[in-house]
């Protein structure tokens, strides 16, 4: 597939209808081991045949080289090699071009299969079950035939390959010890980064690991505030949500928050690696107030600061 596989990816704009449906579309692929892997379609710009790469000195682990494609010079990661799988370079014959937090990169894989649509409540976090894959898989879902699909944790892959970006200097918020941000993300890398930003801002924080857990905790807090005759906004000044999460995604979580009067006045900020205009449109459809791409700590603090002062 040297050409762009538009027949496979179709129109991304049409997929904005998924907002609030608690569904996602997964592109299935293999790395030559018989296992099936998946990645969110929204992360993929195109699929093409693997092409000759240029090697540069001191390339990170798992990076086979760089390639020039449609005006972009992008690093190309060999997923089989990155995951410690003994596979010949020739067997990795397809390349998925992904956009992640405004960065574009290629993933070499053995074969790209098809796109499936799944409910987020059928996606389960792996916890520590897949330590053999170095934490590079963060969720599982089951196909109709009973076979499992491992969902790649792109955030962890990129941190493992390229390291973590420094958050930078973040000013403390006046009276921050009396302010609180509730955040939810299924990625341990993301939670660590968010916590670092909030710590530097000097504000209190509460967190959950997926949308379902977040909504359960938020409902309990809302019920407690209501019983006490208090406003929940006095306890939580902002809610930060990821887009992709097992069991309940950030779009459905936002819908729940925005349709519940007890959360009136609490802004919802979507903090996501899905940085395309289509994803922003999906967020707006369900009531997201602000959008911040991962992992720009300064942008995150700049977005939260006026919300905390309100």
Question: Model-derived features: where do they sit?
Answer:
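An acidic, low-aromatic, low-complexity terminal/linker signal
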Residues: 1-230, 234-239, 243-252, 259-267, ...
């Amino acid at each position: 597939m040297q050409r762009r596989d538009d027949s496979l990816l179709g129109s991304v704009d049409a997929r904005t209808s998924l907002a609030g449906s608690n569904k996602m579309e997964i592109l299935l692929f293999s790395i030559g081991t018989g296992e099936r892997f998946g990645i969110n379609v929204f992360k993929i710009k195109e699929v093409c045949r693997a092409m000759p790469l240029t090697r540069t000195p001191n390339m990170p682990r798992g990076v086979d080289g760089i390639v020039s494609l449609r005006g972009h010079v992008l690093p190309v990661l060999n997923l089989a090699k990155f995951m410690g799988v003994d596979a010949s370079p020739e067997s990795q014959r397809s390349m998925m071009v992904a956009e992640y937090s405004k960065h574009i990169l290629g993933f070499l894989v053995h074969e790209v299969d098809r796109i499936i649509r799944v409910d987020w409540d059928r996606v389960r976090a792996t916890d520590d079950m897949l330590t053999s894959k170095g934490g590079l898989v963060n969720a599982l879902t089951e196909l109709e035939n009973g076979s499992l699909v491992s969902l790649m944790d792109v955030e962890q892959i990129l941190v493992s390959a390229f390291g973590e970006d420094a958050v930078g200097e973040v000013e403390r918020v006046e009276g921050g010890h009396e302010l609180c941000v509730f955040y939810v993300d299924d990625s341990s890398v993301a939670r660590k980064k968010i916590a670092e930003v909030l710590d530097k801002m000097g504000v209190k924080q509460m967190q959950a690991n997926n949308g379902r857990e977040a909504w359960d905790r938020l409902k309990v807090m809302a019920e407690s505030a209501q019983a006490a005759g208090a406003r929940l906004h006095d306890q939580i000044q902002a809610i930060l949500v990821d887009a992709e999460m097992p069991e309940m995604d950030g779009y459905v979580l936002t819908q729940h928050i925005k349709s519940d009067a007890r959360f009136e006045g609490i802004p919802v900020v979507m903090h996501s690696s899905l940085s395309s205009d289509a994803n922003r449109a999906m967020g707006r459809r369900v009531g997201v107030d602000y959008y911040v791409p991962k992992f720009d700590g300064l942008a995150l603090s700049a977005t939260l600061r006026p919300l905390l002062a309100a």
